[in-house]
Amino acid sequence: MITKPLKVALFPQEIFWKDKASNIDTLIRLMPTIHPETDLLILPEMFSTGFVTGDKEEVRALAERNTGKTIDLIKELASQYGFAIAGSFIADTGGSLYNRAFFIEPNGDETFADKKHLFTMAKEDRVFSRGHDRLAVRYRGWNIAMIVCYDIRFLYGVAIKIMNTT
């Protein structure tokens, strides 16, 4: 049951293409500017690398596992600032690459979902594998869909999932 509004902050950072260190530094530097009453901070798609497609091995070099440095940092920041953080990163499962959404809660709970509708005009489908699950997170009484960018154009299935999340 929803008991209060959810205060959401968007983080429209300048993305340095393929430059994880600069993108992570920007996030760390600007975190103190986020309003302290924020409940959820939403980062851009592939916030740590920029939207990268093209050569699969080049993309793989930028990828991480769910237990990599990027997610470890997001967990640390969510705990430190007391709000959930959502976004996406390039995930490597040891074989396939995914544009993977994350939702990290201040208590360390984590949820991951892979982008389902890959953007063929940017050749995303040639590099990344498609996700299959439609996931929603229950956070502070709200059902929040785990979708990435182009997935938003296909909301029917997302709406069904949100309505059925308890």
Which residues fall in each region the model found?
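Active-site catalytic loop in hydrolytic enzyme cores
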Residues: D92-T165
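Short, solvent-exposed loop/turn segments at secondary-structure boundaries
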Residues: D19-N23, E124-D125
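Short, acidic/polar
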Residues: S22-M31, F154-K161
